[in-house]
């Protein structure tokens, strides 16, 4: 597991934990058969640099599996989702005394484009993108180097 926050690494159950950044991965070229990233991509300062780094550390034919959230594609569902996540994140933030963190989650969904747009690049072949969850706002994309 790689995370820039040591506290987050302490929470996970992976055996190998490294403090690091997805935009500057601390691994040699062609190191991994697969890279898995969950609910992080929309928070990167430079997602394009992150894609370049994942490509660099993957072996030829390696898979990049990305799980994250975005707004639904449909305009009406996107509006409902935006209203719903605003209210839910506000409530959870108030109840847990973490309003700043939960407001950030709501706002991060607005700045993140649809995966089909954001992840289209010359580095990877996209194998599939599957939308899940209510309104399809959670997605899983599998790409190959």
Segments predicted by a language model, with ranges:
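Short glycine/proline-enriched coil/turn segments at helix->beta-strand junctions
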Residues: 12-17, 60, 122-127
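Class I SAM-dependent methyltransferase SAM/SAH-binding core
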Residues: 1-25
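A short acidic, Gly/Pro-enriched loop at the edge of an enzyme's catalytic core
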Residues: 23-35
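A conserved beta-strand element that flanks and buttresses the S-adenosyl-L-methionine
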Residues: 36, 65
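Short catalytic micro-motifs in class I SAM-dependent methyltransferases
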Residues: 39-42
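Core SAM-dependent methyltransferase catalytic element
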Residues: 120-145
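A short glycine-rich, Lys/Arg-flanked "PGG" loop and its adjoining helix->strand segment in the class I
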Residues: 48-63
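C-terminal alpha-helical "lid/dimerization" subdomain adjacent to the S-adenosyl-L-methionine
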Residues: 2, 67-121, 130
């Amino acid at each position: 597991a790689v995370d820039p926050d040591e506290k987050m690494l302490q929470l996970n159950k992976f055996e190998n934990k490294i403090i690091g950044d997805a935009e500057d991965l601390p691994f040699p070229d062609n190191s991994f058969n697969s890279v898995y990233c969950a609910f992080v991509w929309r928070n990167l300062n430079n997602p394009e640099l992150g894609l370049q780094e994942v490509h660099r550390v993957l072996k030829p034919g390696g898979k990049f599996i990305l799980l994250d959230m975005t707004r639904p594609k449909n305009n009406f569902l996107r509006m409902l989702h935006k209203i719903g996540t605003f209210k839910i994140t506000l409530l959870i933030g108030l109840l847990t005394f973490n309003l700043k963190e939960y407001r950030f989650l709501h706002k991060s969904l607005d700045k993140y484009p649809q995966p089909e747009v954001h992840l289209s690049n010359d580095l990877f072949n996209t194998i599939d993108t599957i939308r899940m969850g209510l309104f399809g706002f959670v997605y899983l994309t599998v790409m190959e180097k």
